[in-house]
Amino acid sequence: MLTRVEQDATDREATVLGVDHNWRPTARWNIRSRLLGSRIDQAGDRVQDLGATVWADYEMEDGWRQQWIAMHFGNDLQINDFGYLSRNSTNYLHWEVRKRFTGLPDASRYSSKDWRWRVSSSHNNHGDKLNDQFRMSREGQLRNGSYEYAQINVNSAGLSDMLLRGNGVVRLPANFNTYFEYERPRKGDWAHETELETFTGGLAGNRKLGAGAGYTATYFISDAFSIYAGGYALYTPDWLVWQREDLVGGFKRRQFDLSAGLDWVVDDRHELRVKMQAIALDARVQHAWRFDPQGYALAATDTVEDFSVRNLGFQVRYRYELAPLSYLYVVYARGGYEQRTGTEGVEDLLQDSFRLRDDEQLVVKLSYRFEI
C-alpha cells in the first residue's frame, strides 16, 4: 500500500509505503512479513526511515502452537499518516507457546480453554532495554455461553525514553499487572460484564499496589430494545505525570468512569442508539522528581500541584434505511473537557461533568447506493 498525505496548514507532506508478504512453506508453518517506509517533508526538512516485522506461527500436535515475532522500527519511522504506530525506535522479540484444551469432561463448566505463555524483550535503537516481560493468560468459553479471560504480566526493570518527552530517560523498577474479565450473555432479561485488575508501577515498583474494578449491566426490555449502565473505578498509588523539562510529578490518582446508553431497533428500517460516558479524575501529588543523565530519580524541590479532570461525551444516533445499503444518519453530539488545579473529590467531579458543554454538534449524513 502506498499513501500520500498533504497538509497545507502544517506544511507537511507524508509518503508511506507498506509491503506485506505471506508464506506457507508447509501446512504447519505460516510466515508473515511486512516492510514499511516513510518519507516526511515538513517546513523544508525531510526525514525518512524504515521498519520491518516478521510473524512466524507453527502448528504442532494435540492443539499446541508456537509463535515468534520480531519487529524493528527506525528512529524516524512515521506511519501515523496512514495507520498507527505506538512508538518508533523499537526492537522487539517474543516467543509464545499456546495450548488449546477441548473435549473437556461433561462435568466441567468450560467447553474450551486456551492457555498462552509468552516471553518478550524490547529495546530502543540506542541499546537501552525498555523491559523484559513474562506473560501468562487463559481464555475460557463456558458451556452456558459465558466468556472469561485472565492475564498476568511480570515486567523486569527497564528504561522509559518517552516519559520525559525528549529530555532524558527514566529508570523504572520491576512491576507486574493482572487482569480478569468475565462476560455473561443474556439470560432472561439481563446480561453482565465484569472487569478486575491489579498492578504496580511508577517509581514505587512493587512496593505499592493499584487496583481497578468495573461492572456493566444490560437490561433487555425486548429483543429489539435494551439499556445498559456501568462504571469503572481506578486507583493508582504512584502515577507519573510529566510537568516540564525533566520534572515529573508522582501522583495518587483516583478515577471513576460512568457509561450508559440504549440500543433500539424500532423496526427493520429505523434504529436509535444513545451513548454517554463521563470521566472524573482526582490526582494528588506525593512527590516531585528530576532525573540525572543515567535516568536515576532525584528528589526535587520544584512545586508540583494537585489537579483534577472531568470529561463528558454524549451522543444520540438515528439511522433510517432509505433503500438496501442506503441510509440517512442524524447524529447529535455534546461533550466537554476541563482540567483544573487543585482537587475536589471524584464524586463532585463526576456530578460537575454533566454540566460540560464545550462542544455541541448536529450532523446529517446521507449514504446512497447507485447502480450503474
Give the location of each predicted region.
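Aromatic-lined, polymer-binding surfaces characteristic
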Residues: 1-23, 30
